[in-house]
């Protein structure tokens, strides 16, 4: 089975862009709600989650991290700043990237999944 990533993104254009950038490396499952994300994580056991904190709350990151502590969470936002980055990290995110910088998101997911596998070994 191919490694998978679940993406929670409300904007269809950004979702397609992220899926296109992640697809060469991962099987990508797009979700549009917190409930669908949670179900997908339980069902598919992805290597990482990409979640846009512009539309979803940091408490969603905290809850996801609490429920799945070994699952890397990469957050995105149109215009992330240092304060938001720090708050997301404190909530359990592995990183925060601009949502339109697909290369940065891919690098962060690859790095986070590699670190997660190393920690599990």
Residue spans of the language-model regions?
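Acidic, metal-coordinating helix/loop segments flanking the phosphotransfer/catalytic sites
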Residues: 32-48, 56
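Two-component signal transduction core modules
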Residues: 49, 73, 96-97
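Conserved acidic segment of CheY-like receiver
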Residues: 2-13, 18, 49
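Short amphipathic alpha-helix used as the core "switch/output" element in two-component signaling
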Residues: 58-70
